[in-house]
Curated annotation (Swiss-Prot):
Pfam families: Hormone_recep (PF00104), zf-C4 (PF00105). This is Nuclear receptor subfamily 4 group A member 2. A motif (nuclear export sequence (NES1)) lies at residues 443-452. The lineage of its organism: Eukaryota, Metazoa, Chordata, Craniata, Vertebrata. The gene is NR4A2. It comes from Pongo abelii (Sumatran orangutan). InterPro entries: NHR-like_dom_sf (IPR035500), NR4A1-3 (IPR003070), NR4A2 (IPR003073), Nucl_hrmn_rcpt_lig-bd (IPR000536), Nuclear_hrmn_rcpt (IPR001723), Znf_hrmn_rcpt (IPR001628), Znf_NHR/GATA (IPR013088). The keyword Transcription regulation applies.
């Protein structure tokens, strides 16, 4: 491929780089004794390896073919600039040209320039007769313009300083950069920048622009340049790693919630299930640490703190209770003997020891917890429309309204508790007559037990099954003295800090127990034993029996207290029937008659 090789003559003896000049003749030719012999070799060889480049500059002959130093066409084009140190080579070719623009104020393209797709070929021009330039030292950084003569001055001291700093090899593909100035910039100047790795940007610049070479500025005014005939897009030849950075797409982000579920506790992204429930890694770790350390938390509010992704760390008590409420099973958390041994059995003990109790039936306790959670109102959807913190119960309304409210609360809870009973494993397998008998006999006990576990006796706040919230004083005229016994039982129950798994077992045992007139009492007894064993294993595996002696006995001791409270409730219904201010609903009347002990 034909190319152009620059052949520079030496400067006159004693000429310095700071005193070189150009002279422009009327014929359009340039004359130059450009550099000292030391600088003649500075023709783009930055290290000892040759740098070959096929120029892609437009109409190179327009700028250079009339210099006093001749240009000959030789294949291939070789520019050499010796520099102390090692050598490296760079080959710039096949640079695609874009945005070719022919300016109307320039003469048409001559046949000396023959563009090619990717490279530019030049027709050889006749070498002009060398002329002897007049050397004149210029201390001004700008060019003088005396008519048709243009004296060129550059501060090559900075260039020499730059050469001394370029003694390390220059990496390939990092020497040239071709840029395009911002839109609207006049296209009357050409910029060459040698900054670090050699960059040769061919940009249109404003008039009188300054060129920086390692911190030194060279001012080149407009009169020395010919107007550019082509506009170039920004072409950047950089390191290969830089090119790859713009071509290789970034990997897709991990943890996208598109194909993942949500944590049942806080609503964060959850990839899989932990301890029986789909939860996030944060709630899984919190639940595991709490169970392994047998941590006890205290709620500083009303035990109904919101637990979501943003506020899950505010109240540990409410977060742990929600973990239990959604069905996370403490029995499946690894104990000390299995901690950190994913899927491996503990090492065989050296001395014989008592066999550990079998793990509780996870399916049974999980089903009991799930049934309890599904039958309780959500703390975020409670009905406070009728709640009054300090009501004047003696003046608000008459007895008829309070008695009707009492009956409505009982009947509204009955359907919810019946739905809870049908979800207990094994209960639906009993005869229908036994199911009805067990439910009707234990309804008032379950009503009191569930009400006492949900309510806040310290504030006198009662939360019923249908989500209605009332103050204790609002229930006195309807419930009578029974409400005081319920609040006292609630206070004692919550002082025991019963977790939701143990409470679910106690609630099931309150219904699945021995009753008169059962058709298949043996099957009821078997189901009762399963629930008792489940509760016993739960207490044992959670170290409740070690830290709190007779804890299981205290839990089971709440069942006789419920029988007493149930009797008080029957007495209240009997009193209201005798008062006959409001007739009881048929279902309450049947319940009262079926549960009479005589």
């Amino acid at each position: 491929m034909p190319c152009v090789q620059a052949q520079y003559g030496s400067s006159p003896q004693g000429a310095s780089p700071a005193s070189q000049g150009y002279s422009y003749h009327s014929s359009g030719e340039y004359s130059s004794d450009f550099l000292t012999p030391e600088f003649v070799k500075f023709s783009m060889d930055l290290t000892n390896t040759e740098i070959t480049a096929t120029t892609s500059l437009p109409s190179f002959s327009t700028f250079m073919d009339n210099y006093s130093t001749g240009y000959d066409v030789k294949p291939p084009c070789l520019y050499q600039m010796p520099l102390s140190g090692q050598q490296s080579s760079i080959k710039v070719e096949d640079i695609q040209m874009h945005n070719y623009q022919q300016h109307s104020h320039l003469p048409p393209q001559s046949e000396e320039m023959m563009p090619h797709s990717g490279s530019v070929y030049y027709k050889p021009s006749s070498p002009p007769t060398p002329t002897t330039p007049g050397f004149q030292v210029q201390h001004s950084p700008m060019w003088d313009d005396p008519g048709s003569l243009h004296n060129f001055h550059q501060n090559y001291v900075a260039t020499t300083h730059m050469i001394e700093q370029r003694k390390t090899p220059v990496s390939r593909l990092s020497l040239f950069s071709f840029k395009q100035s911002p839109p609207g910039t006049p296209v009357s100047s050409c910029q060459m920048r040698f900054d670090g790795p050699l960059h040769v940007p061919m940009n249109p610049e404003p008039a009188g622009s300054h060129h920086v070479v390692d911190g030194q500025t060279f001012a080149v005014p407009n009169p020395i340049r010919k107007p550019a005939s082509m506009g170039f897009p920004g072409l950047q030849i950089g390191h290969a790693s830089q090119l790859l950075d713009t071509q290789v797409p970034s990997p897709p982000s991990r943890g996208s919630p598109s194909n993942e579920g949500l944590c049942a506790v806080c609503g964060d992204n959850a990839a899989c299930q932990h301890y029986g429930v789909r939860t996030c890694e944060g709630c899984k770790g919190f639940f595991k640490r709490t169970v392994q350390k047998n941590a006890k938390y205290v709620c500083l509010a009303n035990k109904n703190c919101p637990v979501d992704k943003r506020r899950r760390n505010r109240c540990q008590y409410c977060r742990f209770q929600k973990c239990l409420a959604v069905g996370m099973v403490k029995e499946v958390v690894r104990t000390d003997s299995l901690k950190g041994r994913r899927g491996r059995l503990p090492s065989k003990p050296k001395s014989p020891q008592e066999p550990s109790p079998p793990s509780p039936p996870v399916s049974l306790i999980s089903a009991l917890v799930r049934a309890h959670v599904d039958s309780n109102p959500a703390m975020t959807s409670l009905d406070y429309s009728r709640f009054q913190a300090n009501p004047d119960y003696q003046m608000s309304g008459d007895d008829t309204q309070h008695i009707q409210q009492f009956y409505d609360l009982l009947t509204g809870s009955m359907e919810i508790i019946r739905g809870w009973a049908e979800k207990i494993p094994g209960f639906a397998d009993l005869p229908k007559a036994d199911q009805d008998l067990l439910f009707e006999s234990a309804f008032l006990e379950l009503f009191v037990l569930r009400l006492a576990y949900r309510s806040n006796p310290v504030e006198g706040k009662l939360i019923f099954c249908n989500g209605v919230v009332l103050h204790r004083l609002q229930c006195v005229r309807g419930f009578g003295e029974w409400i005081d016994s319920i609040v006292e039982f609630s206070s004692n129950l919550q002082n025991m800090n019963i977790d939701i798994s143990a409470f679910s077992c106690i609630a099931a045992l309150a219904m699945v127990t021995e009753r008169h007139w059962l058709k298949e009492p043996k099957r009821v007894e078997e189901l009762q034993n399963k629930i008792v064993n489940c509760l016993k294993d739960h207490v044992t595996f959670n170290n409740g029996g070690l830290n709190r002696p007779n804890y299981l006995s205290k839990l089971l001791g709440k069942l006789p207290e419920l029988r007493t409270l149930c009797t008080q409730g029957l007495q209240r219904i009997f009193y209201l029937k005798l008062e006959d201010l409001v007739p009881p609903p048929a279902i309450i009347d049947k319940l009262f008659l079926d549960t009479l002990p005589f």
